[in-house]
């Protein structure tokens, strides 16, 4: 399954043969900066075509091989998981670039779902020890009552 795609270093993870590590080379990252910078994060949120466009930019740089590989990995019961990331964090890569990259990867796999809690098509999680929200979903110890008033 592991094939060679120019601009990517693809190998089996050292800890588990079920995980495929995909490193994105600096040269390819530099080619992504211009098409990714055409759109800001707000455009990604509200304009579906922008999400498609950045996904296409990523896939075009791999001659449409990356989307095929990612889907094969996820559908293969012997693997089912991949880690894709820049090989090196170059100075032009920031959090917004990484959100755009993950959005592009998600769209290469399939149509992503809308995250209603975050209100976005992508998710950014800040991991903290405490959660002060009032959501019942995050408080398993609170009884949920069923209402019969319609």
Label each region the model flagged.
Residues 1-150:
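Fe(II)/2-oxoglutarate oxygenase catalytic core
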């Amino acid at each position: 399954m592991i094939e060679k795609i120019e601009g990517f270093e693809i190998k089996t993870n050292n800890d588990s043969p079920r995980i495929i590590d995909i490193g994105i080379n600096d040269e390819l990252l530099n080619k992504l900066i211009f098409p990714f910078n055409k759109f800001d994060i707000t455009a990604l949120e509200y304009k579906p075509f922008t999400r498609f466009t950045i996904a296409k930019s990523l896939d075009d740089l791999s001659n449409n091989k990356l989307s095929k590989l990612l889907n094969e990995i996820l559908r293969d019961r012997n693997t089912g998981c991949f880690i894709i990331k820049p090989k090196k964090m170059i100075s032009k890569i920031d959090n917004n670039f990484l959100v755009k990259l993950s959005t592009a990867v998600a769209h290469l796999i399939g149509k992503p779902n809308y995250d209603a809690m975050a209100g976005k098509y992508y998710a950014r999680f800040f991991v903290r020890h405490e959660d002060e929200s009032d959501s019942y979903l995050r408080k398993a110890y609170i009884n949920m009552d069923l209402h019969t008033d319609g």
